[in-house]
């Protein structure tokens, strides 16, 4: 599990207007809520098909004081996926983890200036916490990825911010005309098969 979890895990309460105009309020404006079904999570998963979200209450965390992103390039999808599994089974507390295809790596590198090896699958691992904790975690990530044959490099500051902004906003406004943009949930073990299918 990544550091902050998903939207549904951060949601405490919400107000939704349903298709018939009725208003549904669910959850509570406190962290502890154990009464009845947790319908707000159902509305989050519906992606707007069950009603229009008009109000939401979220659990907040302070902005970490220190952040670093580790990059590693892999010659094959199998190697990069094995590294993902090792990271997820480790004690690393990741803020973000991105598994990047060669085509996406090329696009992101051209827009941000962040170095990525051509033709490689990449992993980007973001660690954010107090300085000592980040340094210790980066060292742990370096060891894990190094055991999978990857050369790891670290970015920070403006380069790090521009990279994650680009990843967040993909595919961006310059996506090819006529292309559809889809969101899909994939079981981690099936990621290599999905990548391969999309690259065909």
Task: Describe the predicted segments one by one.
Residues 1-200:
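Noncatalytic alpha-helical scaffold of FAD-dependent oxidoreductases
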């Amino acid at each position: 599990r990544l550091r902050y979890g998903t939207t549904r895990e951060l949601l405490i309460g919400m107000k939704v207007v349903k298709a018939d105009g009725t208003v549904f309020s669910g959850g509570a404006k406190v962290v502890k809520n154990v009464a009845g079904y947790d319908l707000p999570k159902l509305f989050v998963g519906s992606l707007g098909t069950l009603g229009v979200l008009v109000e939401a209450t979220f659990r907040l965390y302070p902005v970490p004081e220190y952040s670093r992103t580790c990059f590693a390039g892999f010659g094959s999808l199998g190697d990069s996926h094995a590294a993902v599994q090792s990271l997820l089974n480790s004690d690393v507390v990741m803020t973000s983890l991105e598994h990047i295809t060669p085509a996406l790596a090329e696009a992101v590198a051209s827009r941000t200036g962040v170095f990525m090896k051509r033709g490689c699958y990449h992993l980007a691992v973001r660690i954010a916490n107090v300085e000592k904790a980040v340094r210790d975690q980066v060292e742990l990530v370096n060891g894990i990825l190094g055991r999978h044959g990857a050369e790891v490099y670290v970015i920070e500051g403006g380069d790090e911010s521009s990279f994650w902004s680009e990843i967040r906003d993909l595919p961006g406004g310059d996506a090819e005309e006529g292309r559809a943009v889809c969101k899909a949930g994939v079981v981690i073990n099936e990621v290599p098969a999905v990548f391969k299918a999309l690259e065909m």
